[in-house]
């Protein structure tokens, strides 16, 4: 199959970028011809505020570049990942103008929330969910604490809602979990065209041993990731192993301070994927104490691949991905004493931990391998090719 894959890469590489790269590699390994179209957020600095806002709503350059690619290569499917801010929904119309079905993987909550997190002021927030215009987000400057940036993101959502883009220009939306699917539907996406396909890991890194005995956190060092809760819980523990924190972000100074005060806390900064996988495999457990809902962090699939159980906040997608007491443990979000109690369970009972390791690896083999993902993705492409969208735009020539 000939497939065009488009993605707007982030300034700070993260799990979403890795997911796209893994999916492209998996498609190529299965014999598909993949045409790649990329933008990178490093280019935003040269655009200026007005130029970036305009491109967020309708990127003329992405439209024309993609139109040319569609005409040259004639792919059977156009598969979009992140289109914000440099690709924009204009890309769908470039595909539609060439009668090419559109699949959109939704890696976050950007289509229903200006900051893509459903999170504000230290708490889960759904104030804009289902609104034609997300004015609460503008009032609170939810995206980058900027009125201009939030207004641009909100305008993009509102303009394309008014144009019917979300309803008519996309054949299939791919949510990463059932929880995320439900939130996207609450936000206005057509239920019959939102399907679920989880993240996966390719190639399979193989199980680790857990022999390191430490706890590891991997991710962006920011408030929504629950680092305050993790550090508070760590202070409540009696005898404790090492806590390795891998990543960078706005809370780096606070993490560094915690490491200076407690020699069991180690901040390792950002690490390449190979080192991250090794750290996960040797850990007793992976920590995911997020205050926000999360969607499907790739690091969870990586932990399961290595046979490492996950201790996570028991809300949002995590409550559906992690089987409590089987592939990991869930604690009450933001509750440091409850998290400390769950860590004590993990650390005190090697037999339970061994069973969890086996269960986590089995969950990976069952649901998160490249083979399982490829089967699901092919079914999604068949759905898109089968004309699953009765409201679909007819081929148009849009010259904005």
Residue map of PLM features:
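A conserved mid-protein helix/loop that constitutes part of the nucleotide-sugar donor-binding site
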Residues: 17-18, 213, 217-236, 250-254, ...
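Donor nucleotide-sugar binding/catalytic pocket of nucleotide-sugar-dependent glycosyltransferases
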Residues: 111, 126, 130-206, 266
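Nucleotide-activated donor-binding/catalytic signature segment of Leloir-type glycosyltransferases, i.e.
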Residues: 253-274
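Short alpha-helical segment that forms part of, or immediately flanks, the ligand-binding pocket
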Residues: 277, 295, 300-305, 319-320, ...
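Acidic donor-binding loop of glycosyltransferase active sites
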Residues: 281-295, 308
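Short hydrophobic beta-strand element within catalytic cores of glycosyltransferases
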Residues: 309-312, 322
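Conserved acidic donor-binding segment of nucleotide-sugar-dependent glycosyltransferases
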Residues: 324-325, 329-336, 345-351
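A short, well-ordered alpha-helix in the C-terminal region of glycosyltransferases
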Residues: 338, 345, 352-367, 373-379
């Amino acid at each position: 199959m000939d497939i065009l894959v488009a993605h707007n890469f982030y300034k700070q590489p993260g799990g979403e970028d890795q997911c796209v790269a893994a999916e492209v590699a998996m498609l190529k390994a299965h014999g598909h011809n993949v045409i790649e179209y990329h933008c990178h957020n490093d280019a935003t600095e040269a655009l200026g505020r007005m130029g970036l806002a305009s491109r967020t709503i309708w990127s003329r350059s992405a439209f024309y570049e993609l139109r040319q690619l569609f005409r040259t290569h004639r792919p059977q499917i156009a598969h979009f990942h992140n289109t914000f801010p440099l690709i924009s929904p204009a890309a769908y119309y470039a595909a539609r103008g060439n009668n090419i079905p559109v699949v959109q993987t939704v890696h976050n909550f950007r289509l229903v929330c200006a900051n893509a997190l459903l999170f504000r002021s230290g708490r889960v927030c759904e104030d804009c969910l289902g609104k034609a215009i997300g004015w609460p987000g503008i009032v609170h400057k939810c995206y980058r604490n900027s009125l201009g940036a939030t207004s641009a993101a909100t305008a993009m959502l509102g303009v394309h809602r008014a144009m019917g883009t979300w309803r008519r220009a996309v054949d299939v939306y791919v949510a990463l979990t059932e929880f995320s699917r439900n939130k996207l539907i609450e936000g206005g996406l057509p239920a019959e065209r939102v399907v679920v396909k989880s993240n996966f890991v390719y190639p399979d890194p193989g199980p680790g041993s857990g022999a390191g005995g430490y706890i590891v956190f991997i991710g962006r060092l920011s408030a929504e990731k629950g680092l305050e809760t993790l550090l508070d819980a760590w202070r409540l523990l009696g005898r404790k192993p090492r806590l390795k924190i891998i990543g960078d972000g706005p809370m780096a100074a606070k993490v560094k301070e915690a490491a200076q005060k407690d020699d069991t806390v180690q901040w390792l900064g950002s690490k390449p994927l190979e080192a991250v996988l090794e750290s996960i495999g040797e850990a007793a457990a992976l920590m995911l104490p997020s205050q926000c809902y999360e969607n499907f962090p790739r690091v969870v699939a990586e932990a399961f691949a290595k046979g490492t159980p996950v201790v996570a906040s028991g809300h949002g997608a995590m409550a559906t991905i992690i089987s409590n007491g089987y592939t990991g443990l869930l604690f009450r979000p933001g509750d440091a004493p409850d998290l400390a109690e769950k860590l004590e369970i993990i650390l005190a009972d090697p037999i339970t931990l061994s069973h969890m390791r086996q269960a986590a690896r089995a969950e990976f083999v069952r649901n998160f391998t490249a083979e399982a993902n490829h089967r699901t993705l092919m079914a999604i492409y068949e759905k898109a090719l089968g004309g699953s969208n009765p409201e679909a735009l007819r081929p148009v020539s849009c010259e904005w």
